[in-house]
Amino acid sequence: MSLITSGVLLTQSQDTLTFSVTTCQGLRLTKFASSTLKDARLKIVSQKEVNGKLRLTLGAGRYLYSIRISLETGTMQCLTTVLPSTVSVDTLPGTYLESTLQRQNQKSS
């Protein structure tokens, strides 16, 4: 689990991202599943809050996931971009997320 910003929690489990957004209307859960996320080591490439919307860019390998979350309503938009074969998210600055699977493996070790 990773606290992205106050009120937004991100959980990665195999090929699914779950966003928990606390709004004035209550807690809203949104799931994003993609085969490109399977066993992916996600990195937060950028995050910015503008006019009540969180703009989040996550990356893994050659994939970028541009995510916009309305902090008021919890609604979300996602866009997946494939980078050219000569570019990898690993070369970009950012912080890697710890997945649920990684934590389970650490506990069993």
Swiss-Prot record:
Entry annotated with the keyword rRNA-binding: no
Entry keywords, A to Z: Eukaryotic host gene expression shutoff by virus, Eukaryotic host transcription shutoff by virus, Host gene expression shutoff by virus, Host-virus interaction, Inhibition of eukaryotic host transcription initiation by virus
Top-rank lineage group of the source organism: Viruses
The keyword Protease belongs to this UniProt entry's keyword annotation: no
Gene Ontology process terms (BP): symbiont-mediated suppression of host gene expression; viral process
Family: Belongs to the orthobunyavirus NS-S protein family.
Role description: Inhibits host transcriptional machinery, by producing modifications to the phosphorylation state of the C-terminal domain (CTD) of RNA polymerase II. Inhibits phosphorylation at serine 2 in the heptapeptide repeat (YSPTSPS) of the CTD of RNA polymerase II, suggesting that the elongation step of transcription and/or 3'-end processing is prevented. Inhibition of host transcription machinery leads to shut off of host cell protein synthesis and inhibition of the host innate immune response. NSs also seems to be involved in the nuclear relocalization of host PABP1.
Listed name of the protein: Non-structural protein NS-S
Organism: Bunyavirus germiston
